[in-house]
Structures are given as C-alpha cells and as structure tokens.
Amino acid sequence: MPPLPGAELVHNPLQLYRYLLRCCKLLPTESLQHYYRHSVKQSFRVHADEDDPERIQQIIKRAIEDADWVLNKYKKES
C-alpha cells in the first residue's frame, strides 16, 4: 500500500500539515473528517517546538504511514 500521491513531496512540517488536511477531505463522512482534522491540528501544536531534524523526519514518516492506514481502513468499510 503506497502512500497517497504527494507524500513524496512532504519534507517539512508545514507541508505535512497541509498534506494531512487534504487527506482528511478524502474520508467518507463529515464527522470523520472533523475528528481527524482536529487530531491533525492538535498534533501539529504539540510538536510545534520540535527542532531536531532527525526527529522531525521520523514524525513526518510516521504521520504519512498513519494517514495511509486510516484512509485504507475507511475505504474498505465503505
């Protein structure tokens, strides 16, 4: 399961934030979109002070994997 198109272009936290918000629009219901949009925003705030480049890349990689998993989960259910 490759990540969504555009995932390879994510190199910094702001690009990740925008990518994840676009992924939320692909979820099937408005309530799911709202839930995951809120989750993305909260996670961005929590990690806003992160300054270690290696840790930032680790967070980006994990967030893309998690977004792919969530989208595949709801794609199979609907």
Swiss-Prot record:
It comes from the Eukaryota. InterPro entries: Complex1_LYR_dom, Complex1_LYR_LYRM9, Complex_I_LYR. Belongs to the complex I LYR family. LYRM9 subfamily. This is LYR motif-containing protein 9. It comes from Xenopus tropicalis.
